[in-house]
Amino acid sequence: NEVAETAQKKGIALTGEMTNYLHSLDSTRPVTCGINIFFNFLSSIGLGVYSDDKAEKSAENAEKFAAEQAKKAAAAKPEKKKKPVGSEFYNTLACLVGDYFMKCGATLYPCDLKTRDAYANMDIAGYNYGIFRYKHDLKKYPNRLILGSETFCKDAYSFWEIAKKNKRIIGDFVWAGWDYIGEVGDGAAEYSDYKFEDPSTRMTGGNGRIDLNGKPRAEAAYTRVAFERETGPFIAVDPVYQKEKLRLTGWQLTKALE
């Protein structure tokens, strides 16, 4: 999931090898991979993510790096904060520019160039935040099956309307269905007077449709209605009024409680 190597030649080849290997274990099950479409484009221009060249240089300098780290540990000097890479880079960018920008970014032409070969090496194309590409790609690739391998909660209704009209859209996974320990604060709400700066002050992502204790949130009710599994009505209550504006990330539709 969100492995940027799928934009590189070695990663594309490895995708095919892994698909074939999985087929050898069980020929009845289709293989997919969650590819962050915009993320792959960013990787191709070297922004905060993997490339074949970077990987080769890293391998060549592995021993030197280990020695430097040992010296730093011995000196016990505080290190400068590292720039985010991988999914952390994408999450940080999405929090800064918003989910709409990220979904629009996935429609750029180079995004297709940096995903099509990897998709050709699997049975089902996994789209992370690529809902704006669905209709276009269904026409361009008539044999492609599409799975929403990661989507924002607010896109549930849009997904369902497209899926009802297109049988090659086979499913949708929201990020995240259940809150989890890790990626702390990427779905959290905050006020400016309680600005999130120290990751150690939080334990969970804060973005599940179901909270860490198993209680469905208001977003779960919205999803059930959007997918025509419930008719409602559902009543949800916003957090207590504050003078400061409540800030939500793209992974959180609302902080209302059912």
What is each residue range found by the language model?
Residues 1-2, 36:
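Short linear capping/connector segments at secondary-structure termini
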Residues 2-9, 206-212:
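Active-site rim elements
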Residues 15, 20-258:
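Substrate-binding clefts and catalytic carboxylate motifs of secreted carbohydrate-active enzymes
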